[in-house]
Amino acid sequence: MRAAGIVRRALRLGVVVSAGFAALAVVAVGYLRTEVTVRDPVPHAVAGLGAAPSSDAVLGRLHLAPGFRATVYAQRLGPARVLRFTAGGDLLVSITRQGRVLLLERDADGDGRADGVRTLLNGLDRPHGIDVAGGWLYVAETGAVRRVRFDAAARAVGGELHTVATLPAGGMHFTRTLRVGPDGALYVSVGSSCNVCVETDARAALLRVDPTSGEVRRYAEGLRNTVGFDWQPGTGDLYGVDNGRDLLGDDYPPDELNRLVEGGFYGWPFWHADNRPDPEYGDHPAAAGRRPRAPAYAFGAHVAALSINFFPPDRSPPGFENAALVGQHGSWNRSELAGYRVSSLHWAADGRITERDFMVGFATDGQVSGRPVDALPGPDGAVYVSDDYAGAVYRVTWDAREAAPGPVFEPPRPY
């Protein structure tokens, strides 16, 4: 049976309201006055139950920044999440909820689609972050970082999976994102176990893992769920997108872009946005003496920013020379849907950051047809976007004849 079309969550102390999906049950808190609405089909989108789109359907519903066009690169993949390219131009995709890592063979015949799909790994525990370095394929499962020998030319893995390091497993935010850093270390994000609480282990943090010794240490903390992060070309600065807490109304707190520095503390669970105290935890004893770093940029609330990837300097379309793409998975807990798009962030010479629409149309008139996760510039100059609702990867190409700057997007900031 389908869930009710609209489920309203009365925000009263001690009331638990379920939309028929255990993962969406919430405990409301007494000081809130805003009613949070969850609209069907968002629970279905969370569960990844969308239908695979055709190319015509994608072209019919998606709108892109001027000069860009989208096609379906691969479909019927399952709930596709993180994307990474191999040295041979093939595309790796994590299918987290199915425990798989796929390889999409590069488009050698030029028809705009992957030439084939191979399963590299299966039976994993919610694999999410993936990366390749030094002949190894690294995979971040919910409770461990593991690696296996990988031959990019043969498009094959060999030998057994080796555990590099163990991680705090499970929790409300169970995905672990992994990237190989410029220093050769592994950087792994571990989200919080809860909506808002004081953690007792290495959660709500970005961890640095030595790939040889397996030593794990906290690089940055106070990050509720920084699913996506990347290093900015030129400066080497590390930026991450963080998902703000729930149950403070439609428009607060914002999702954040943070410049992540070693030893940095970014506020959660004690402060949000421009370091405003949390109504539950702002005066918690554990907050005493801590100084949070302010966000570099604030997105709209609950847009669920899950990825950030900078354009390489040698493969940037005009107007995107110092820009990054952000996949906004979309809200489930607002009276009106937010996110469900890919945006671009642009750094001015003075450091000011502006946001523009890059790829929109995944949700229209309250109806969800897709949920973007990763948006990764490829070695061929195209952008590849994963959609874990439709089970697809889209290929976005640029045509200089139609290029023009898109409008600057300013999210609402009621705080």
Predicted regions and their residues:
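N-terminal Sec-pathway targeting helices
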Residues: 2-22
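Beta-propeller domain segments
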Residues: 29-65, 175, 192-195, 211-214, ...
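Surface loop/turn motifs at the tips and blade-to-blade linkers of beta-strand repeat domains
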Residues: 73-77, 118-124, 164-170, 218-222, ...
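Structural WD40 beta-propeller signal
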Residues: 76, 86, 133, 179-183, ...
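Hydrophobic core register within WD40 beta-propeller blades
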Residues: 83, 130, 178, 226-229, ...
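Hydrophobic beta-strand segments that make up the repeating blades of beta-propeller
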Residues: 90-93, 136-139, 186-188, 238-240, ...
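A short loop-to-beta-strand structural motif that recurs across blades of beta-propeller domains
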Residues: 100-103, 136, 144-146, 205-207, ...
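Asp-box/WD-like beta-propeller blade repeats and closely related beta-sheet repeat scaffolds
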Residues: 115-117, 126, 131-133, 143-181, ...
